[in-house]
Amino acid sequence: MRDFIRKSKADGKTKMIFDLRGNGGGNAILGYDTFKQVYPQAEQEPFGGTRFRANDALNQAGKITQDFLAGKTFAQSNATVFTEAFGRGVTQDDIFGFTSSFNYQHTLDANNKVFRSWEQLFGPDEFNNDTFTTTLRYNYSDSISTTYTGFSVIGFGANLNETKTPQPFQAQDMVMLHDGMCSSTCAIVSELLKNQGAVRTIAIGGRPQPGPMQGIGGTKGAQVFSWDDIQVRMQAVFFLGSPAQRTQWNNTDLGRTAFATQLFTRSAYQGGRIAGGVNLKDNLRQGDASKTPLEFMYEAADCRMFFTAPMISDVTQVWKGVVDRMFKTEGRTMCVEGSTMDKTSVSGGGQFRGGDGKINPFAGAATGNGSRGSNNPQQFTGAAKGRAEERVWWVVTGLMMMGMMVM
């Protein structure tokens, strides 16, 4: 993507469309990196706040992992005991990988500070008579957090010097194209681009009626775990214990999760692997005092358009429709009736609107216009005139799979 952006700038392109239609997501860290590709400044660090539900099984797993990191578990008492627990060929590095989700040392708090212990991470915090962990953030400088060996998010690790790269496009010169089929990592990057970047959204399709439309219709959860992934991780934690501990854990949620059977009997399978899974992490908006998961927030696009017959056979007609509505002076008049200036959209002043309906005007890093999020609606901007109009856009599509198209 970095090469794509550099080429687009070298070719004199002035606008960018993120075509996120039909995007079911992918590796979460790519969503954060995508944001940094267009906002490389050091002060533009993606928030990406998440949390777990604070239940007993998670707490037990975190405590045992904390003991494992300190070399205090029964399985670490000698090599024979470890082999009896996990079998030949399994190393402590392997177990370190399986328990990484419960490792307090490889995540940061809401203020980008390290956790001193599992207990500090776990909390719990109480909201609406339910309990959750404290807010968690990725440590983008930590390879355990980024999941890809040798991969560095723009502005961190091997790409630290990228913070000196000029921002390739201003917020008003970028737009996201949605069709309702956006979930998971797609929702993550959309949240960052909208609320930290002030990038507007246009939605296409929907029911044949006037009014606004949400661009994101899929899950807005921060991370999904398959059933078998959860079970393997819990088993790794379980077998770190002594025989007496395991007997005790068998009667707890930890043991019941590690050795669940009925769930696997009833679930569908795909490619020889269980198809079921669960979203284990909420995605939280920066500055939202209510800490409402994004899953429960309504977010209308800044504009909406219907499909036309030419768009069905020619995708460039879709992109042209985006340009006409989002980058031209009178573009808003071409949007579906009643679909503009919704209070939850960027142009309607909804940047950083929390689940309680309140806006934190000081949340987040600087926007693409060099100012922090505010209550002032961002108006639709006019297109460049003359020759500039001929070089109006690049299109990025299939973002989470990192496939790209240009025109």
At which residue positions do the language-model features occur?
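N-terminal signal peptide
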Residues: 381, 402-407
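C-terminal "post-core" interaction segments
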Residues: 1-382, 386, 391-398
